[in-house]
Amino acid sequence: MKVFYDSDFKLDALKEKTIAVIGYGSQGRAQSLNMKDSGLNVVVGLRKNGASWENAKADGHNVMTIEEAAEKADIIHILIPDELQAEVYESQIKPYLKEGKTLSFSHGFNIHYGFIVPPKGVNVVLVAPKSPGKMVRRTYEEGFGVPGLICIEIDATNNAFDIVSAMAKGIGLSRAGVIQTTFKEETETDLFGEQAVLCGGVTELIKAGFETLVEAGYAPEMAYFETCHELKLIVDLIYQKGFKNMWNDVSNTAEYGGLTRRSRIVTADSKAAMKEILKEIQDGRFTKEFVLEKQVNHAHLKAMRRIEGDLQIEEVGAKLRKMCGLEKEE
């Protein structure tokens, strides 16, 4: 798999173009500011006088309605939540798409699953930082960047690569390294990682460990430290050095205990469940479920949020984070 760097990309394809960033959340703010600071012509499209309107203006952006931005721009970069994109696209963006324009995303969900079907003659690309928005912005300001992905679904103008690579350079991704992939691969692997490991798997593992210790009579504070708080230390070691060097940095007791017991926690059944989760992503079952959830105003999701908020580990964690001086990071 080829990795591109700053010297591989040029901004030339965007020099005379206008980029409309639709949305001003964490990624919208970071990506738009980075491209603006890279000398690109950026406008921000938002709901008139919405919560983000004044924030974007305060950051020095040329702010306009989504319709105005879509009409004005050559590249329309959609960074609003996945479940809102199709509706906004149909009513506020599609009427202003003309041949030669480029539709861009940072997640392939709506293109891959067919919720957005662009007209002929329009490029469809993706540029995705592999980091939260705050880090995208901070590392750019520090003179570096975060890794990212680019992909091309439709190259209607025969220069879609030049356009998306220039966007990646403008955001600062090529300072760290950019990998070219496909909408299918980006979407399916991203969803799987979130569900099985990063958001779903890890939180369930932490909860189970915490509850096991508390049910055995140990202090909830001790349980939190040992199953949640210290996780960051291990993840940071893996992030910086990989598995092998993480094992080198922990004690022999931790290494032996971890290596000999881990397969009893994540079993063959766990991997079978992961394969089923991946299959649900690949065949569209998860997508249908998520669409139905939106149709009932996220009733199930809201109920799950309430349950998570009432967990004992949340109450204990809030106290300990305050004690550790971490409350400012929340």
UniProtKB/Swiss-Prot annotation:
Q: State where NADP(+) binds.
A: 24-27, 47, 52, 82-85, 133
Please state every residue range assigned to the domain named KARI N-terminal Rossmann.
1-181
Similarity remark: Belongs to the ketol-acid reductoisomerase family.
Q: Identify the residues that the record assigns to the KARI C-terminal knotted domain, covering every copy.
A: 182-327
Output the HAMAP family linked to this UniProt entry: IlvC
Q: Which UniProt keywords apply?
A: Amino-acid biosynthesis, Branched-chain amino acid biosynthesis, Magnesium, Metal-binding, NADP, Oxidoreductase
Give the record's pathway. Amino-acid biosynthesis; L-isoleucine biosynthesis; L-isoleucine from 2-oxobutanoate: step 2/4; Amino-acid biosynthesis; L-valine biosynthesis; L-valine from pyruvate: step 2/4
Q: Which source organism?
A: Methanococcus maripaludis (strain C5 / ATCC BAA-1333)
Residues that hold Mg(2+) 2 according to the record: 190, 226, 230
Q: Name one GO biological process term.
A: L-valine biosynthetic process
Molecular function in Gene Ontology:
ketol-acid reductoisomerase activity; magnesium ion binding; NADP binding
Catalytic activity reads: (2R)-2,3-dihydroxy-3-methylbutanoate + NADP(+) = (2S)-2-acetolactate + NADPH + H(+); (2R,3R)-2,3-dihydroxy-3-methylpentanoate + NADP(+) = (S)-2-ethyl-2-hydroxy-3-oxobutanoate + NADPH + H(+)
Which co-factor is required?
Answer: Mg(2+)
Q: What class of enzyme is it?
A: oxidoreductase
Task: Classify the source by domain of life.
Answer: Archaea
Cite the InterPro entries for this sequence.
Answer: 6-PGluconate_DH-like_C_sf, KARI, KARI_C, KARI_N, KARI_prok, NAD(P)-bd_dom_sf
Function field: Involved in the biosynthesis of branched-chain amino acids (BCAA). Catalyzes an alkyl-migration followed by a ketol-acid reduction of (S)-2-acetolactate (S2AL) to yield (R)-2,3-dihydroxy-isovalerate. In the isomerase reaction, S2AL is rearranged via a Mg-dependent methyl migration to produce 3-hydroxy-3-methyl-2-ketobutyrate (HMKB). In the reductase reaction, this 2-ketoacid undergoes a metal-dependent reduction by NADPH to yield (R)-2,3-dihydroxy-isovalerate.
| UniProt KW Oxidoreductase keyword | yes
- Please identify the protein, giving its name as recorded: Ketol-acid reductoisomerase (NADP(+))
